[in-house]
Amino acid sequence: FTDIADFVIMDEDGSVSIPVEGGTRMTENLVGAHFPEYDGFLVLSHFKGHAIAGFGGAIKNISIGMASQEGKCLIHTDGASHTSPWGGAQDPFLECMAEAGKSVQDSLNGNILYINVLNRLSVDCDCDSSPAEPDMHDIGILASTDPVAIDQASVDLIYEAEDGASLVERMESRNAEHVLQHGEEIGLGNRSYDLVSID
């Protein structure tokens, strides 16, 4: 990919702290040290299942995806560890993801466009070393300026799909929609949306 464009490893030079406003679990989020160099992002997410979060989409990418190594550990452990990502309780982890995402969005004054690609829909994340093969059809591509709305629409389309049972089970068994509920409660976005089809 370096033949296509230059790239930056956001946390290759460590972490920088950004504030979490209105959170119930976090007061700061640790993102990559290069984060302040940007005034906006296009967040392209392959929507899919996830072994811990239930699903991964826009919110996961602006929280876990933007976090430094230390920040990832803080999100996963409800602030208990800077060095290990394991051992946190499920709902607090989901709430920390929403709050970390809000800190990123607030720091950029909402200057983010989100695109979720709903294809090759597996119960597992691309970060899994041996993910399950997709077992449902491709759905399409969504775009929004609201990370909660785009992830809610993505979840709803999975529920509407005739072949979405395995991904629905993955989401429900992880209480995945809690990240959307908490995200809406803290002002990250809105679960209500209008789905406009563009052919």
Residue ranges of model-derived segments:
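Extended, low-polarity segments enriched in aliphatic/aromatic residues
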Residues: 1-199
